[in-house]
A protein has these predicted regions:
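NAD(P)+-binding Rossmann beta1-loop-alpha1 motif at the extreme N-terminus of oxidoreductases
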Residues: 1-21
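Conserved beta-strand segments of alpha/beta enzyme cores
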Residues: 2-4, 50, 72, 117-119
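Short gly/ser/thr-rich secondary-structure transition/capping motifs
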Residues: 6-11, 55, 73-76
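Rossmann-fold NAD(P) dinucleotide-binding segment
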Residues: 16-65
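Short, basic, helix/turn surface patches
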Residues: 18, 32-40, 100-109, 144-155
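Short, hinge-like loop/turn segments at secondary-structure boundaries
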Residues: 20-26, 68-70, 91-94, 136-139
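Rossmann-fold dinucleotide-binding core
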Residues: 57-118, 125
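An accessory alpha-helical subdomain
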Residues: 120-187
Length: 187
């Protein structure tokens, strides 16, 4: 597959140069930027291209893309972080109403060509499940630190595996906090 990327600033000239001949256009932008980007992007699509996103929530961006674009729309959510194990490369595919099996298959094929496994879901089921999983992740992380803060006598007994869990929790609560704040608000 031929890949062309666009970065900021996203100008009409950049869209006009990059999009002719594209079979699919993937928006790798914050879901909150969708409303700002779509009016500039959609006039450069001819209705046959697949418009897809890569975002952590699905209902809002999928709805925005479908309202802005009459062609096929497919939402995607890679369910892994920046340093995944090969077995962790799963991607949720959320087809829009105008997407046929051919459109969905092309998007799934792109991810499979990169070593990912895919599964399909509705946007509603995705967002409900993602909110539950991320909520549990966030709450359990808070529980670790709240418990240890009140029971320092436990610290000498922490195992290496629990220390790794604490480090992941610390990262989630400090470095990833803005992302989780946005996810909670979007769900």
């Amino acid at each position: 597959h031929t890949v062309a990327g666009l970065d900021l600033p996203l100008t009409d000239e950049a869209f006009a140069e990059a999009l002719p001949g594209a079979d699919a256009v993937f928006l790798c932008i914050p879901a909150g930027a969708m409303a700002e980007v779509l009016p500039h992007l959609v006039p450069h699509l001819d209705g046959r291209q697949i418009l897809a996103d890569i975002t952590s929530v699905k209902m809002q961006p999928l709805g925005q893309m479908e309202r802005a674009y009459a062609g096929p729309v497919v939402g995607t959510h890679p369910l892994f972080g920046p340093k995944p194990q090969p077995s962790d490369l799963r991607v949720c595919i959320t087809p829009g109403a105008a997407a046929t099996d051919t459109h969905i298959g092309l998007v799934e094929g792109l991810f499979k060509d990169m070593g990912c496994s895919t599964f399909r879901s509705t946007a509603e089921a995705h967002d409900s499940a993602a909110a539950s999983i991320q909520g549990l992740n966030f709450i359990s992380s808070l529980a670790y630190f709240a418990t240890l803060a009140e029971h320092e006598e436990l610290l000498p007994f922490i195992t290496p595996s629990f220390r790794r869990r604490l480090e992941a929790s610390r990262k989630l609560l400090t470095e990833d906090a803005p992302l989780f704040e946005w996810l909670f608000e979007a769900n």
